[in-house]
Amino acid sequence: MSLLAYAAAALAEIAGCFAFWAWMRLGRSAWWTLPGLASLAAFAALLTLVDSPAAGRTFAAYGGVYVAASVLWLWLAEGQRPDRWDLAGSAVCLAGTALILLGRRG
């Protein structure tokens, strides 16, 4: 459930932020901000579904997922193929996510 929540949260956050990007940078209507705000609220709610007793650890692990999902958005939504640095950076961030999620505690 946690991986699905992270993926859904990333999609919601990126879509919400892109709505504001579209308004402020691409000249789209300010009406784009309404679904953007709803998407950002969904993002916050989705992170509460992650099975973790600590918000900070949840947010830190999510960061790597966000970076990788943003690079995927770059490619699929914006039509710009990621370069090797985008992919390498995403891999490093996902390795950090794995360390946070799978590291032994105690």
Curated annotation (Swiss-Prot):
Disulphide bridges, residue numbers: none
This protein's UniProt keywords: Cell inner membrane, Cell membrane, Membrane, Transmembrane, Transmembrane helix
Compartments, record wording: Cell inner membrane
Entry's transmembrane regions: 3-23, 30-50, 59-79, 87-104
Annotated Pfam families: UPF0060 (PF02694)
Entry GO terms, CC: plasma membrane
InterPro entries: UPF0060 (IPR003844)
Membrane topology designation: Multi-pass membrane protein
Matches recorded under HAMAP family: UPF0060
Family, as annotated: Belongs to the UPF0060 family.
Name of this protein: UPF0060 membrane protein Mrad2831_0929
